[in-house]
Amino acid sequence: MVGDYRHSAELYATLSAAAPADRIVAGRAVAQAITGGEMAFALQLAKGMAQSPDLGVDARLLLVADELRNGRHARGLALLKASGGEPDLSFLAPTVEAWIVGKRDGDAALTLLSQVPVGSPVGPRVAENRALLLLKLGRSADAEPFARRAIGLAGGRENRIRLAFADAFLKAGDKPRALAMIEGRDVVLAVARRSIEQGKRLGMAIDSPADAFSELLLGLAIDLNRANGKALPIALTQIARHAAPANVQASIILGLMLDADQRPDAALAAFRSVPPSSPLSSQARDGEARALIRAKRLTEALTMAQRVTTTPDATADDQSRLGDVLAAMDRDGEAGDAYGHAIALVAAGGPGGEQWTLQLLRGGALERADRWPEAKQALEAALALAPTQPLVLNYLGYAKLERGEDVGGAEVMIARASALAPEDASITDSLGWAQYKRGRLPEAIVTLQRAAASDPAQTEIHEHLGDVLYSAGRRFEARFAWQAAMIGAEDEVAARLRAKLDVGLTPATAAP
């Protein structure tokens, strides 16, 4: 039944019909249907057990979402306020009621929002809803500080919330504040700015009780997704989509969750449901590319990424995405060239990511392609743009160290990176390896042991530690380190480790 959620739900429903007193089985049928995105079937099942005290939280939320979506606000609110269910869902009621009341009494709506306790699971969304309700009243100056606070709390929803506020400020007749909500070089924001500057809304409004409920559920899903367990966050996101089908951010978040749950086909369907005209379509394409890469469907990923870069409005993000796909295919030279195209677009004033990040990606790809002079130039450009970025300092320093180029300067770079990011095990590993290359074995052993303790699963750290221990004459301990490295090793690295375990450290088996 794993993966076939419709079949699972139907089976549970059949079992429930055979044993109507067993509400647990019925609840599982609803849960399976929701998780699989079979919302019509889930609603049919949930409505059949709506009066049951054993109705699951996902089924209850789906019934609320359906009532709000269809404009039956009083019934949806009553379901939220109903006592007897576990867990108690009434903490969602004040926000939803505020949106319902706000149609006729804005001040009463704001009073209802003030009833949400600071420690409530939806407490972080109060500023967001207050700003949106104030904007519905045309009070844009009052809304602005709450909007900015909400953006700061939005996390992974930041761009979506910025776009919603831009829409709301424009609708309230305040174009300057609408534009202020979407400042920045991000491609999503740049695309949105072009529309707002022309006085065109973005289609990203949060403008109804159903929209607000959808966003509440999406925020809860993201919060819960940080903990172990994927089923409830996925269910909440599916319900958020049902409450507000136009909420493309919910589709993108759902795709990311499904991909992490190793359901690539469902994830791709979610990403591909986002229309190309959406301001968030770039995020959806990023998710689609990552899902295809994780599923080893690299030809599909390449076709998609190349297609997007041939359009007249292709952006630096599109070129960077192509670079990511090519890098996943080990076509590193072409990946470096794609990142180079992205850099050129940003340098010409187009929207896109930070140039230092793109230069780092380009340098890394070219270094793997054995185009070291070009790689070094890109990495040095990244360092000039971001002289205190640990990733840049470490990458350039380590690349020089591997080539025996300015070894003293390379160690200084890596030591600086380690001082800036002492908790980063990979950088600590680089520092230990630099100390080894400089002949300071006791110091290198201590540093590499610290790195291994910080990230016990990283193969490279254990291999480095084993090499240094062996060189220091501590060969028994070296074998333990190499055996630990074998756990996650693949292909050439695994073969090198096996050779070391058989014959010890030689110039041919030394880590690069």
Language model features with spans:
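TPR-repeat structural position
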Residues: 5, 39, 73, 106-107, ...
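Amphipathic alpha-helical segments of tetratricopeptide repeats
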Residues: 17, 84-85, 151-152, 186-187, ...
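Generic helix N-cap/helix-start motif at coil->alpha-helix transitions
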Residues: 19-26, 52-61, 71, 86-96, ...
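Terminal, low-structured helical/coil segments at or just beyond the last alpha-helical repeat
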Residues: 201-216, 459, 471-512
